[in-house]
Amino acid sequence: MNKILKGDNQNWAEYEIDSISLALATDEDVLNWSNGEVTKPETVNYKTYKPEKHGLFDELIFGPTTDYKCPICGKKYKISNEGSTCGNTEECKREKPEILPKISRRSRMGHIRLHAPIVHFWFFKVDNSIISKLLGLKSENSNKYYSKKEIEALIYYTSHIVVESGGLNSLPKHTVIYSDNAAIIYRDALEEIRSKYDRSIPEQNEIIEEISEALVNLAELKNANSSKKENSKQEKDYGIDFYEYNEIIEEYSGAKIKTGSEAVEYLLKNFDLTAEQEVIKDKIKALNEAIEKESKTSQSKVEERKKLYKRLSIINAFINSNQKPESMLIRNLPVIPADLRPLIQLDGGRHSTSDINELYRRIIIRNNRLKKWQESNAPQIIIQNELRMIQESVDALIDNQRRSPSPVVSKENRPLKSISDALTGKKGRFRQNLLGKRVDYSGRSVIVVGPDLKMHQAGIPRQMAAKLFEPWIIKELIEKEIAPTIKSAKKLIEDQNPIIWPHVARVIVDKPVLLNRAPTLHRLSIQAFEPVLIRGKAIKLHPLVTTAFNADFDGDQMAVHVPISDESVREAKELLMANRNILGPKDGEPIINPSQDIILGLYYLTREVKGAKGEAKYYMSYDDMYAAYSSKKIDLHARVAIPYRTVKAFKVNQNVEYIISTVGKFIFNRAFPDNFPFIFDNKFDNYRNNEENKYLVPKGTKLDEYIKNLPVNNPFNKKEIAKFVRIVFDEFSGAMPISKIASVVKKVNSGNYHDTVMMYADLFKDKQNKKSVRHAQILANYTKQEFEKINKKLTLQNEGVERVWDSKHRSELLEKIWFAYNNIVASVLDKIKVLGFKFSMQSGSTFSINDIKTSLDKEKYVKEGEEYINNLNKMYENGFITDDEKYTLAISEWAKIKEKITNSLKKIIEDNKENSIFMMMQSGARGNISNYVQLAGMRGLMANNVKTLKADAQNERVVRSTVEVPVKSSFLDGLTAYEFYSSTHGARKGLTDVALNTARSGYLTRRLVDVAQNIVVSEDDCGSDFGLKVKDITDTRTATIIVPLIERIEGRYLNSALYSNEGQLLANKNTLVTEEFADQIVNKYNIKEVEIRSILGCHTRNGVCKLCYGKDLASNAPVNIGEAVGIIAAQSIGEPGTQLTMRTFHTGGVAGVEDITGGFGRLIELIDAFEKPWGLLAQISKWYGVVSEIKESKTASNKLIVSIKEDFKNTLRTEEVSKDRKLRVKVGDRVKPGSKITEGPIVLKELLKYTDARTVQKYLLKEIQRLYRMQGISISDKYIEIIIRQMLSKVDIVEPGDSNFFAGSIVDIFEYQEENGRLLSEGKKPAYGKVIIKGAKQSPLLSDSFLAAASFQETAKILVHSAISRKVDELSGLKENIILGHKIPSGTSSKYEVDSKYDIRDPKSFFEDESKYEYLKFEDKWIA
């Protein structure tokens, strides 16, 4: 721990934890923690409600129930007496009670001294019994190891074990004695002992007599038992008094026989760890040699070696951690602090208690009873029973759920919650209280749309704001002397006195709030807004941010949180503000895109109509034109001319006079910044080729003729508007850090404020760049505007005399410029939103039954289909086709007919462009052709809720997931009763699938976050030269491109110099591939494969470097150090998971390979690295070579033999394939290891076995990308790479060499590389290991951090293994720091660079060094 002293005169210290380690608690540790022994099972006195002395709530042990009050005499002390002892009465002097606050009851522990050692439940129950693995017990004369069950029988006193044989051949060491074999074992042992004594010696004669008597008793017992065929359980268990015979044997020989925890204690104490370690190493060595010699590896030897590896790992854990195995026994049981297991008083004198108290009570009662039996020399059988009961009661306290089949239950027959249950699961300590905490200063309400809000604003109901900002409002009310005290101010707020509202409005200025909508699937589900007070009780949300939140206004609720500290407020403003989060992190495309009504309005606004009212008119300015439009002299869609100089600062030929466009497009273009090109049509990309010159006309042109001959352009649809938004973002998003703007603001004064362009231009690296010039102009304009505003305000305050600026005013100016500069894109979107809403209202779009135009050809096509089906039925009846064939043919025929109807409707849409419904469809506002076909054509085939079974997929059966008879009516015609019923299956299935998918998707995201949570960008360059060669990802079966090369390289760095096909150098290593450069590489230079830096080859441990990661998609700039890319990756893959369909995604037909390639199920198979994926598995080639022939097998009639001629060796290799499998290869095809011979999913472990890690990585990347792209979801490669890297980040040690590893251990790949690097540098033999693949379920459990692993799943197992190896958690990841309440080591708490997005200094900090001016009034002048 690091001790950080706060303040000079304070004598207290705050501790900051550097690392945390877990070890076995010894008896001494427990006594050191304890403040006293609990000896009574009582809790509180039921009359006085005071804790009982020496009970489970004793104030002397656990601390007082009232602050600073003596628990014995009740005297109250002051806070300054804390830590002293009370000496008020004789008893106080004797007991010396400490004076403490009552909060100490949450930390002070006690203990119970057990009168016999107890085996800790976890160590013989969790992970197949640690004790069993450690001891590896077997009888001396047998090779069979005792199972976990046999060790448990010993612990629970149902068997005895020979711990020392004392030289007796009949009692081999470690023989386990049960009641059914006891008589024989004891008889043989007693006879062997008797034979060692000589009758002729008088002293020994007595011994022989005693042994003989015991033997006679044994024989009688044996006969009695065998004569009773159905002897009762009692007699079977207790027929033989083990203790009597054990005593005789121990007395007359050196043998020792023990049972229960005493036996386990003896075995653990006398267990030689180092000797056993050597023995196991030798055995493993011998096994390895045997396995190498064998041509066919025997599975039993591999299994035996696996077991030995596990034993060795446990023995090594104890040796390396320097702990004693007997620490797994409990002699002093810790009692957790009283307030962590509270006793709550209910009305009517009843109490509700925590289950743990009940479990402790059982232990204390049994322990006290055992002491009584022991002191009164009770029969051994009674003591044994009591010992067993204590063992069971301690087990129940530790882990009651695992005590199957009979956990301890309460009066209501509910299993009691033990300590383990309080840790594990969703409601356990880790997930409920450490990783997720309740947050103060929060509220929630229904959301409604706020179309008049700015992008960075949210409407907060004023009653809510009054409560959320209560402390600040109270301060304001007291300062303004409206309320004299805190209490009275609170009263005003609670009563909602009208006097408070102006102050509430003043308080919330500059205090952002966070809005969150559950489920929080990605980081854009929490964003910051500036609060605006509204009346009413619903939160008003900006319509454009709904996509990011996945919200709609049908009753969704959102939560509001208030950032309190200055740092959190700055973070909210700089990083979380909605106007900064324009791009979605998963694909780098704008997530804030206009949609629905706005799109419809813009589509209407930008229409062009030939011969519209006022066409070819000329106006002197935009204002004149707008006035004419307002007074209805010209139509919105008319094409008119305006002098080009009044519209945009065009740099065109001097003879150009007019600019031609529609009134609507002139209005639309006003929404964009002044120096943004004018958008004439949807060929905006071609403006570089002067495509727009046809709209720029020289003086003297006859406008009416010229305009008549111009082609009519289509209005702008959703895709085009999204493209414009993207271009605005690329051109205008902030390119200059605040520190550089501050350097200009420092120099600005009333003499130079109107001309700062050059000051700003000098700050850009590339001054000549168009973008740099544009940004310098923008910043200069903002500087001028804001300077004038502030200067005017200061001059007014100063009675007309100009004032000298101080740091406060400069920081205000900087804040204003910085906000405006970063708000350009958002302000454009806001203007677009206003136009969209306004013109969608003006367009008067309606939706009526008359608008639904239908096709006359429909009946003809339906008749065709019916005739075809009749023919099919006849063929089926005559036996020409099977039922399955009839079904598949019928389905495909109806699909074709629906396609024909769709095409005929498309023609009608083309001819009726004015139609409201078609406008909605074509603009992209709502609906698509398939919706319209159901409305006006025919509904077509309906889905049927059929479960596809694994057997169906493996045998390629036809699964009837579609109803054979289609719905022939459209909604316009109306459905018949049968058709309505037929369509209900699919509708219900759709709803259930969505519900199931949402839950699975949430769980997937959680697992992915756990896999990648500690991956943060942590350095500039890791120096790796291990790149990834990328080309188009293609589907080899259908030869379609899944992800084009241009998308894969854009935003990544090159791993090696790039040359054109002619050998010309295009770029050096580590060059960032921009969008333009990527376009040139693919389209200009026609390069098919590029080697890029990849996360899969990054050498940064517990993170990635900037070069291997590339561009940050959410900001379209190189990634910053401190970015938590692991979590962003997990969210980007998990968030669209809900959109992936379930497994039953197919249009009826064979449940084969086709339908299993898609859907959520397949994604889970890949990410969890399933051993047996769904369906028929692919057979893969194991060799490089060429397919030489494919022939029928001579031995099996249903098999084919695929022969492969191996390269280099010229040997023929054969693969046996089932005849009913679809072959992927033909004769002459080249194959390499991992190539598919038959269709189907590849088993990842098999692929890894025959190829290498890189092949598996590429296969996973391709498969996961295919799943998402099939559903139209684009996710960047780099996110999938992060998850894949984690899945292949462990190495299984095969040959340890001179390393610290041992064979069979699984180590982190970085650890493996570091250790081997060290060994090679010292000239020693390096370790050899194989990369293994672990799915998302196992990956987090192998984490270096036991806190992160334990909080994921299998908590008990993780904690047990961490304790025996004294594991240290270095707190490097995010999760473990959250658990400890630290700031997470990413973002603003990381080692970020200066001027990066995480460098969120307060604007005031840039002017702190300026000398402070004191202003004096002197002869009506201000002097400093």
Curated annotation (Swiss-Prot):
InterPro entries attached to this UniProt entry: DNA-dir_RpoC_beta_prime, DNA-dir_RpoC_beta_prime_bact, RNA_pol_asu, RNA_pol_N, RNA_pol_Rpb1_1, RNA_pol_Rpb1_3, RNA_pol_Rpb1_3_sf, RNA_pol_Rpb1_4
Phylogenetic classification of the source organism: Bacteria, Bacillati, Mycoplasmatota, Mycoplasmoidales, Metamycoplasmataceae
Keywords on record: DNA-directed RNA polymerase, Magnesium, Metal-binding, Nucleotidyltransferase, Transcription, Transferase, Zinc
Keyword set includes Secreted: no
Top-level taxon of origin: Bacteria
SMART domains according to UniProt: RPOLA_N
Co-factor: note: Binds 1 Mg(2+) ion per subunit. Binds 1 Zn(2+) ion per subunit; 2 are expected compared to other organisms.
Keyword Metal-binding among UniProt keywords: yes
Leading EC class: transferase
Gene Ontology MF term list: DNA binding; DNA-directed RNA polymerase activity; magnesium ion binding; zinc ion binding
Gene: rpoC
Enzyme Commission numbers on file: 2.7.7.6
Subunit structure: The RNAP catalytic core consists of 2 alpha, 1 beta, 1 beta' and 1 omega subunit. When a sigma factor is associated with the core the holoenzyme is formed, which can initiate transcription.
Protein's name in the database: DNA-directed RNA polymerase subunit beta'
Residue positions binding Mg(2+): 552, 554, 556
Residues engaged in binding Zn(2+): 1022, 1098, 1105, 1108
GO biological process, one term: DNA-templated transcription
Family the entry assigns: Belongs to the RNA polymerase beta' chain family.
